[in-house]
Amino acid sequence: MTNIRKTHPLMKIVNNAFIDLPTPSNISSWWNFGSLLGICLVLQILTGLFLAMHYSSDTTTAFSSVTHICRDVNYGWIIRYMHANGASMFFICLFMHVGRGLYYGSYNYLETWNIGVILLFTVMATAFVGYVLPWGQMSFWGATVITNLLSAIPYIGTNLVEWIWGGFSVDKATLTGFFAFPFILPFIIMALAMIHLLFLHETGSNNPTGIPSDTDKIPFHPYYTIKDILGALILILFLMLLVLFTPDLLGDPDNYTPANPLNTPPHIKPEWYFLFAYAILRSIPNKLGGVLALVLSILILILMPLLHMSKQRSMMFRPFSQCLFWILVADLLTLTWIGGQPVEHPFTIIGQLASILYFFIILVLMPITSMIENNLLKW
C-alpha cells in the first residue's frame, strides 16, 4: 500500500515541498534563511493578532493602548517586544537571504527572484505601516515624512498624499488606514511566499558551486528538516535574548513620547533596517531625485540577472567578484550608520559617496569584473 502522504491530494503537496523534495547535497547554512523567514512570518502574524486584540486605532487612545498592553495585559509586554524585535529578526534574515542570492547567483531563477523582490517591497511596506501604529513621536513624524515623499510624483503627487492621509495631515483616518494594512499585508506576503516556493520547486534549489546538481540530490527530510530546526532554535535564542534582556536596543527612545504634531523631533529617522535606503534618499538634495534613488536602491535587484556577465553562476570560484561583494556589504553597513546620523558635515558627504559607490559597484564594477574574470579563464 502506498504511503498516504504520497496519495492524499493535500498531503501530496506538503510531501513534494518539504519531505520528498530532491535537494542538492551540498547546500550550506546560507540556505537556512528561507525557512527562518517562514518562521518569522508566522511569528509576526500570531503576535500581531494578539496585539490587535488589545490595540485601539484612535489617535487619542493608540499610545495608551500600547502602554496598557505592556502593563496590564497578561504577558502583553513579551508579545509586544517579540513583535517589535521579531521584525528586526525578519529583516536580518531577509538581508542574509538576498545576500546569499546575490553571492551564489540565485537570481538566474528569474521568476523566483522577481517574486522575491516583490516580497521584499511588501515586507518593507508592512514594517513601515506597522511602525506608525504605536503613535509615538517617531511613528507620527516617520509617517508624515515618508508619505510626504509621494508628493514628489509629478501631477498626481499632492492628491495621492492627501488620499493616503485621508485629509490634509496625518491624523485619525491615517492611523485607522495604517491599522488595516498590517492586517491584510501579511496574508498577501504569505500568498506571495507560496508562489515564491512554487517557482523555486519548478527549477529546484541552486547550490554553492552554481553547477547543476541533478546527479547528486538527497531528500529534504530528514537531512534538511533537522538542519532547519537547528537554524530555528538559533533564531529563537537570539530573538529571546533581545526580548528578555534588551527589548528597546533597536527601538527609538523618541517613540516613548506620545505623538505631537506641534513638536518635531530633532532627528527623524526610521527603524534601523530602513536606514541604508533613508541615507540614499537623503544624499540627493532634490526631492524627486531622492525618491527615485530610494526606490531604485531596492528595484536594482530586478536588474541583477541582466547585469550577470560571468560564465560562472556562483561567486565561489571568482575571487575578484567576492572582493567586490564584500565591499558592497561594507558600503551598505556604512549607509546604515549614516542614515542614523544627523544631516551635517562630515556625514552628508560620506552618505553621498557611499550612495554613489553602491550604484557604481552594482551597475558598473560587477559586470566589468565578471568580464575580466571570463578573460582570465582563457589563460
From Swiss-Prot:
User: How does the entry describe its membrane topology?
Assistant: Multi-pass membrane protein
Q: Where does heme b b566 bind?
A: H97, H196
GO molecular function terms attached to this record: metal ion binding; ubiquinol-cytochrome-c reductase activity
Where do transmembrane segments lie in this chain? 33-53, 77-98, 113-133, 178-198, 226-246, 288-308, 320-340, 347-367
Q: What does this protein do?
A: Component of the ubiquinol-cytochrome c reductase complex (complex III or cytochrome b-c1 complex) that is part of the mitochondrial respiratory chain. The b-c1 complex mediates electron transfer from ubiquinol to cytochrome c. Contributes to the generation of a proton gradient across the mitochondrial membrane that is then used for ATP synthesis.
Q: Which family does it belong to?
A: Belongs to the cytochrome b family.
Q: What is this protein called?
A: Cytochrome b
Native source species? Blastocerus dichotomus (Marsh deer)
